[in-house]
Curated annotation (Swiss-Prot):
Stated family: Belongs to the phosphopentomutase family.
Species of the source: Elusimicrobium minutum (strain Pei191)
Cofactor(s) needed by this chain: Mn(2+)
One BP term from GO: 5-phosphoribose 1-diphosphate biosynthetic process
Coiled-coil parts of chain: none
CDD domains: PPM
PANTHER family recorded: PHOSPHOPENTOMUTASE
Lineage summary: Bacteria, Pseudomonadati, Elusimicrobiota, Elusimicrobia, Elusimicrobiales
Name recorded for this polypeptide: Phosphopentomutase
Pathway annotation: Carbohydrate degradation; 2-deoxy-D-ribose 1-phosphate degradation; D-glyceraldehyde 3-phosphate and acetaldehyde from 2-deoxy-alpha-D-ribose 1-phosphate: step 1/2
Known role: Isomerase that catalyzes the conversion of deoxy-ribose 1-phosphate (dRib-1-P) and ribose 1-phosphate (Rib-1-P) to deoxy-ribose 5-phosphate (dRib-5-P) and ribose 5-phosphate (Rib-5-P), respectively.
Length: 397
């Protein structure tokens, strides 16, 4: 019975991208920065699986993790790093590429300064949604714009619309005063009118709180993403009668394509609990695919290196629990979709290589080197599960 578990650590880059300078990200290294700024990291299980060796090979710098307690995961692993072929450093590009479909075209983007959005676009959205005007209309940090405009939003009922360095149109609205379903409806309207602009995602950002200093996002975020331009490894497994269990953001990221069961979860603990539970219950010929979004959304973008370190140490502490329930035919992958170095300027993603770690009871230990595309992971999954060979990537099985 063969199963694949993919642990996607959103934004967990390990530096060394050859084209980082092109993105203004020269020297960015999420893991190295978090380790250095916290004077070490207690991640013995990730280290035993080859993370630090992979990271040092990726960027050519020493990762200062410091003394470690004994590892509790004792299982064979292959480790290395993957370079991104896709033109962007965004969530969709990274996820699609690791599933065999690199994004070899350019997304549309909005200018950062006010007004970010074309007048006719906003008029179309407002008219169909039955609203007068919007707030924001610029590139901004999601938490900062709530502090700036949250009270005005509650007072006026105008949704807060903003963008970032990614190909996104984000709409923040109060879950109680504005209404969650109303927010989702406006996002669906915006998604329809954004198609000509080649924008990758519309993101609903519900929040709560009554005044400045109290506003915080809720767990009811929803992403409206365009569909991958070609079938992914998830589609091929589904077509072959297999199971694809998405946990967290995965269902939204792939626009529900190739998913047979979508499980909602948020927060590192709940995402881990759900992953463990689904691994216990999943049948053979399955992919269990979890996006651990907090590394990106809660710590990376907010440049919170202490929070990032705490998240890594917690993630590491749950690995033995997963390893202990693995069956003979299980393969686990640990990877990421891009970087988000919390020591770096700005608040955006950083172009970095990502880990490629594979472990399981029947894996042969070894270094797989630097892979030329994230699609090598998808090709490895396809070969292991005996499904259609992908058009991109080389297996490291």
């Amino acid at each position: 019975m063969k199963r694949v578990i993919i642990l996607m650590m959103d934004s967990f880059g390990i530096g060394g991208a050859a084209d980082a300078a092109k993105f203004g990200d020269e020297g960015a290294n999420t893991l190295a920065s978090v380790a250095k700024l916290n004077n070490g990291l207690k991640i013995p299980n990730l280290i035993s699986l080859g993370l630090v060796k992979a990271a040092e090979a990726s960027a050519g710098v020493k990762i200062e993790t410091g003394p470690q307690p004994p590892a509790q995961v004792n299982i064979p692993s292959k480790y290395g790093f993957m370079r991104e072929q896709s033109h962007g450093k965004d969530t969709l590009s990274g996820h699609w590429e690791m599933a065999g479909v690199p994004v070899l075209f350019d997304w549309g983007y909005f200018k950062p300064g006010y007004p970010s959005f074309p007048k006719e676009l906003i008029e179309q959205i407002c008219k169909e949604a039955g609203i007068d005007k919007i707030l924001g209309n610029k590139a901004a940090s999601g938490t900062e714009i709530l502090e700036e405009l949250g009270e005005e939003h509650i007072k006026t009922g105008k949704p807060i619309c903003y963008t970032s360095a990614d190909s996104v149109f984000q709409i923040a609205a109060h879950e109680k005063h504005f209404g969650l379903e109303r927010l989702y409806t406006i996002c669906e309207i915006a998604f329809k009118y954004l198609k000509p602009y080649k924008i990758a995602r519309v993101i609903a950002r519900p929040f709560e709180g009554e005044r400045k200093g109290e506003f915080k996002r809720t767990k009811n975020r929803h992403d409206y993403a365009v569909k991958p331009p070609a079938p992914t490894v998830l589609d091929f497994l589904k077509e072959n009668g297999g199971n694809v269990i998405s946990i967290g953001k995965i269902n939204d990221i792939y626009a529900k394509q190739g998913i047979t069961k979508a499980v909602k979860a948020s927060g590192l603990e709940e995402l881990w609990n759900t992953t463990i539970e689904e691994t216990k219950n999943a049948s053979g010929n399955s992919i269990i695919f979890t996006n651990f979004v907090d590394f990106d959304m809660v710590w990376g973008h907010r440049r919170d290196f202490k929070g990032y370190a705490g998240g890594l140490e917690y993630f590491d502490s749950r690995l033995p629990e997963l390893a202990n329930i693995l069956q003979e035919g299980d393969l686990v992958f640990i990877t990421a979709d891009h970087g988000c170095d919390p020591s770096y300027k700005g608040t955006d993603h950083t172009r970095e290589n990502v880990p490629a770690i594979m472990f399981g009871k029947n894996v042969k230990n070894g270094f797989i080197g630097g892979r030329e595309t994230y699609s090598d992971l998808g090709q490895t999954v396809a070969e292991y599960l005996g499904i259609t060979k992908l058009n991109n990537g080389t297996s490291f099985l």
